[in-house]
Amino acid sequence: MNRRYALSLSGALLASSCMTVLVAVPVARAQQASTAVTSTAASPAAAPRQILLQQARFWLQQQQYDNARQALQNAQRIAPDAPDVLEVEGEYQAAVGNREAAADTLRHLQQVAPASTAVSNLSDLLSERAISQSDLSQIRSLAGSGQNAQAVAGYQKLFHGGKPPRSLAVEYYQTMAGVPTQWDQARAGLAGIVASNPQNYRAQLAFAQALTYNTSTRMEGLTRLKDLQSFQSQAPVEAAAATQSYRQTLSWLPVNPDTQPLMEQWLSAHPNDAALREHMLHPPGGPPDKAGLARQAGYQQLNAGRLSAAEQSFQSALQINSHDADSLGGMGLVSMRQGDTAEAHRYFEEAMAADPKTADRWRPALAGMAVSGDYAAVRQLIAAHQYTEAKQKLATLARQPGQYTGATLMLADLQRSTGQVAAAEQEYRGILSREPNNQLALMGLARVDMAQGNTAEARQLLSRVSPQYASQVGEIEVSGLMAAASQTSDSARKVSILREAMAQAPRDPWVRINLANALQQQGDVAEAGRVMQPILANPVTAQDRQAGILYTYGSGNDAMTRQLLAGLSPADYSPAIRSIAEEMEIKQDLASRLSMVSNPVPLIREALSQPDPTGARGVAVADLFRQRGDMVHARMALRIASTRTIDLSPDQRLSYATEYMKISNPVAAARLLAPLGDGTGSGAGNALLPEQMQTLQQLRMGISVAQSDLLNQRGDQAQAYDHLAPALQADPEATSPKLALARLYNGHGKPGKALEIDLAVLRHNPQDLDARQAAVQAAVNSNHNSLATRLAMDGVQESPMDARAWLAMAVADQADGHGQRTIEDLRRAYDLRLQQVEGTRAASGPVGAHEEALAPPSTNPFQSRGYGHQVELGAPVTGGSYSAEAASPDTSDQMLSSIAGQIHTLRENLAPSIDGGLGFRSRSGEHGMGRLTEANIPIVGRLPLQAGASALTFSITPTMIWSGQLNTGSVYDVPRYGTFMATQAANQCAGHSSCGGLDFLSANHTQRIAAGAGEAGFAPDVQFGNSWVRADVCASPIGFPITNVLGGVEFSPRVGPVTFRVSAERRSITNSVLSYGGLRDPNYNSEVGRYARQVYGHDLTKQWGSEWGGVVTNHFHGQVEATLGNTILYGGGGYAIQTGKNVQRNSEREAGIGANTLVWHNANMLVRIGVSLTYFGYAHNEDFYTYGQGGYFSPQSYYAATVPVRYAGQHKRLDWDVTGSVGYQVFHEHAAPFFPTSSLLQSGANYVASNFVQNALPTDYLSQETVNSAYYPGDSIAGLTGGFNARVGYRFTRNVRLDLSGRYQKAGNWTESGAMISAHYLIMDQ
């Protein structure tokens, strides 16, 4: 429940007028400033300096410090050391928070003019700034709730018995005016302020209102109020308040020849004021003339100290009308001055019963009788929230002669208000045992019984209450129901109780707002709106508007809140309403200025530089950014506000913690609430008021649930349960902890247990749509699709106008494979939610097993479990899509954003699509051998299945590859290709006298050497995939010399938060033209080749073919993936076998571990950083291009450690994703034979290596390798590795998207780069 809902609200004019400073209207008031200056500076002798100082003070009151500084600087140029200039300089420095500079100015002023009034004025101001804001806030709360006597005592304690500081004087005397016994002192104090500064309109208003409180001065007060109404341009706020006070005072007047013209004049200007017209026709209390005159005379005599005459006059008035509240109150004042406390108490009670509307006028008088002595001390303790000491004091007082009833009543009321209901009941019953008909005790005990749900007992007690308390009895019955509702966390029971209360008081706005709030907590937002609709559409009373403001504020409807505030007089502001009005003003002002700056930080600091005793200012600034989706600056505002002072008040802590919860930061909220302890004052922190206690408990339950959910998302269900357990035990009836427990079981891979809990909650309250949604999802997770559909359909039938019912239906329909119906469900949910957000909702509506399911486990059921998250081994840091991690909704409503995202994703998943692109790839290496250039044109078609949960994809990719021409002039390159070693040897032997075994070849002509060419083909592919299995059948490009059938399958089941990934696949190795498409040996059909086959016959034919290469890897891999918050962990390994045509068989083992974490993100961007450790090794080194080699990087051991960094973001239609990595690698390659698959070819190579050098010149060496042996040498290399991969996409329309990508990689002994442009087109618009 919103904290403001729990605050007390005063409906009477007296209570509202005794609060804090009126809120200023946020409009440009330069003209008003000049008008005020002209009025005060009417004397021709007024110096320009005085005018400038008056302007500076005006702008200081408006909190427009730049304008104030300019006016002050102009005055300083005229007379920098004038006392009045120094005084205003100190005022300015104190206002902007520079206390040290203000203290220096005061010291300078004491030196310049030690005897001037400026010294005392500035000293008072700085003393006020040193006052504890939390204490001042508590005192103002007392005044706002009508406890004026206690508030006055609190002020006096705050001022150390001295006079009030100038800035607090008005509110101090205004509060004092509400205490009848101190009214004379208050009038004198306000009169002095007005006399010294006639342009202080707030003081003028307070003085006029105070005069209306007393019958003898009421007419003078009316005259002053009427005069104030004419200052619409100079003081619009005070003028409006004066109008409201004037109207209220008319209803207090008797109808006689003196007052009737005033009423008729009002009605001529306000012809629709039916209440005043009824007052004139049927004045309360019978004939008004004689009674009114007698009452007026009584107050005049009372003010003159003629108590006997005053008593006689009041008795005369009561003989005419025994229910005249003003006369009864007058008799109470007379009795109080005569020292007859009991009689005064009786009269005041009767006065409040006679006219409940003016009851707040006499409650301070009742309290005032006990201001002296021990009772005054008790009230001071209560005002300071020192409830334990106050109760001890009252218990002592009750034992004194004649004090039992009064002290015990006060003690019982205090116990009841602080939640000690049982103790209060005992005290009330003790009073009734002595005084069975004590009306106050009967009503107090009835309140206790109502709060405990003992309705029958409460009504029996109320039946003994005198009829004169009929209105109070009705209020007790309703308030009892409301109290009972507030004490249950069972949302269904709460709604039922409040509906009963609304049936008894259908026009009571506070009953309606409590019911609406309960319905919102239950999730029935539409019904909550219908409950509030009558008072929102047609607010009749000020309390209607007050309740409406609280409701719309709590719903986040700032526009409607401002509209309702515009129709409410500032005189009717309660502390809560005033706080909201200030928040709306702050938001409006800050929003208008934000549009003119690029960096909001200076504005945030300026807005938060003002005192914030209740936390409203910090909440306003943070909430403005939260509503805009700017969580970074929302968090910054809260951090600045909450660390501005160490001594935060309870209101500040509760307000800031509530806002932290709105921006999903339960850790910060918990840290703020820690100093409050349990709220009782027994341990850490002071005792809280009941409404503060309720807010604290609700916040702590919300924090427990939020922290549990956060840890559940991280996969740490054990720690999540530890956070949740206190909430489960503290309130067994609360549903939110139970649903959180179900989510824990769901996250732990036990959807059946989660379903059991959700269903138990749902049976207890079938209207709980949150529980229904959870049950539907749990049923789907448990493969109970028919149950999910039934639950969802029941929800739609019961709540067809609630978006959540259709969201649950969408889950069930998608599980059943009904894609189109799922989109229709989501669209209907979106429309309903949009109506709710915009405020345009159309009005249309066996037990033991359950309890076992609902009961929290006796021990932590999630202990010693792992974590899980999906990630690909060895891949750059990904961690899921950008939208899932950092994208923030364009709208401030999270549900709308979520639904829109689901519709968008499902629409794409359901729409068949076609993709086309053009890609290029280049890999380093020697021309004709390792160098690779590739161009491909992928064409992909996708057909969704099972409501988008699966898809069938067809693709064909025309592909061209080439390696360039072999350098045939190089004696180093030629022997390392195919079988050209023999050809090169033959050519170099030609012309020599003897070549040993090559004499035959030397007699022939030189053989032509040529190699290196391009290949082209097209690769078909058919794929099927869903959330846990993917499979495909494809082929390497058809048209290449060697074509292979390829494919693979991957299973990725998820058990709770842990994902296990197992795959088996057969893929081409695309390192080179040799490994990818295979090569034809040009020497096979040459003269040398034919000669060799002729000589060696069948033995060579078996070991030598016309083609070799086309290598595929048959790979088996397993991996486990986990997550811990924003950190992703993974590890796995595998084994592979490489085969190819006429290529040596090879094998590979590989393993890797890694982690990455989200280090920064905002609404539209994210940065992740990680670390990856990789190992693999092959049995044979086949990274060469002679016959039998594979042409792919295959070290015998490879180790690498890399640090990948990913930056992704989106802006409107543009999105991007860039990953870069850098690291260090070490690998080792063994020596390898030239011809690993042919012993004859290798023996020939050995022969050439050992004999050819005898007949060749040094410049004719076949190659360095042949000098000593026919082996490629091994090698060990260490160095840097790294690269980048970048993609940028742009969506032109809902159906067309274009992507550009590029990459570069340096690893092993190679580098590779690539680029692609591709287009994506959705064929059908779902």
UniProtKB/Swiss-Prot annotation:
Biological processes, Gene Ontology terms: cellulose biosynthetic process; UDP-alpha-D-glucose metabolic process
InterPro entries per the UniProt record, alphabetical: BCSC_C, Cell_synth_C, CellSynth/LPSAsmb/PSIAsmb, TPR-like_helical_dom_sf, TPR_rpt
The UniProt record lists the keyword Zinc-finger: no
Sequence ranges of the TPR repeats: 49-82, 291-324, 325-358, 405-438, 557-590, 701-734
Metabolic or biological pathway: Glycan metabolism; bacterial cellulose biosynthesis
Cysteines engaged in disulfide bonds, as pairs: none
Keywords of the record: Cell outer membrane, Cellulose biosynthesis, Membrane, Repeat, Signal, TPR repeat
Keyword Membrane listed: yes
GO cellular component: cell outer membrane
SMART domains attached to this UniProt entry: TPR (SM00028)
Membrane topology: Peripheral membrane protein
Domain of life: Bacteria
Region feature (Disordered): 841-867
Signal peptide: 1-30
Localization per Swiss-Prot or TrEMBL: Cell outer membrane
Family to which the UniProt record says this protein belongs: Belongs to the AcsC/BcsC family.
Function field: Required for maximal bacterial cellulose synthesis. It may be involved in the formation of a membrane complex for extrusion of the cellulose product.
Protein name listed in UniProt: Cellulose synthase operon protein C
Organism (species): Komagataeibacter sucrofermentans (strain ATCC 700178 / DSM 15973 / CECT 7291 / JCM 9730 / LMG 18788 / BPR 2001)
